[in-house]
Amino acid sequence: MNSQLANAPNAFNYIESHRDEYQLSHDLTEILLQFPSTAAQFTARLNRSCMKIDHCVIEYRQQVPINATGSVIVEIHDKRMTDDESLQASWTFPLRCNIDLHYFSSSFFSLKDPIPWKLYYRVSDTNVHQRTHFAKFKGKLKLSTAKHSVDIPFRAPTVKIHSKQFSHRDVDFSHVDYGRWERKTLRSKSLSRIGLTGPGPIELQPGDSWASRSTIGFPNPHTESEVENALHPYRELNLLGTSALDPGDSASQAGLQRAQSTITMSVAQLSELVRTTVQECINNNCNPPQPKSLQ
């Protein structure tokens, strides 16, 4: 999703963490954020409320020499997702650039679960030693509660640069896109005999589903099959048996079988075989007759 530089909102009712020093690391390292107290979370839970992050600010203040090089990558992860899909937003900026990072959440979370958001950083392509206390991070959180979740208008991440020698051309940031959705039809025994006879409202019959009825359309098997085959060329392979899907032996297996079934000989071995065979023929068929003795 597109992100752009924008004015950050003013701080109001923010929960602030301490401005702590962090060691330089090439691996993802967690930045500790201060969340609402256990008592506040318990009160919200009693009210059966859910919670979201209205606004998150990450302040970065570097403390490295002026000839230090490298890039800092900051990531926000949502631990409700699988590890390979948990990344929500990320920023990349120069190691010597003092900057504020702004993030706006687009979802609620239940207080019955642990707070899912985690903040990490790492440094790449740098000439500064690892484990050097290279910068200070400070987090500010503004959270809100609601009786139930609602759709939240998307707000792109933003940055505010405090170092004059850097500009928006030196930083980059991104946000995850909306997840894709493809409707799955419900299978039933009546699907094979369903058909629409004319334009008019779709009426569900026993054993039908709205998805299956609304995607069948007018009976035109050629048009439907061409469109479906173009969109999903392998959609019905699961109906074939395993023997039909078996491609047979691989090239390596076929080559191995040929190698095992073929006798290979060198030129010297072949010459020796011919010489031995000829010699055996001469010995067996060309011996002179034995002279008869006179009695």
Swiss-Prot record:
Phosphorylated. It comes from the Viruses. The keyword Repressor does not apply. One of its GO terms (cellular component) is host cell plasma membrane. It is found in: Host cell membrane; Host microsome membrane; Host endoplasmic reticulum membrane. The keyword Secreted does not apply. This is Movement protein BC1.
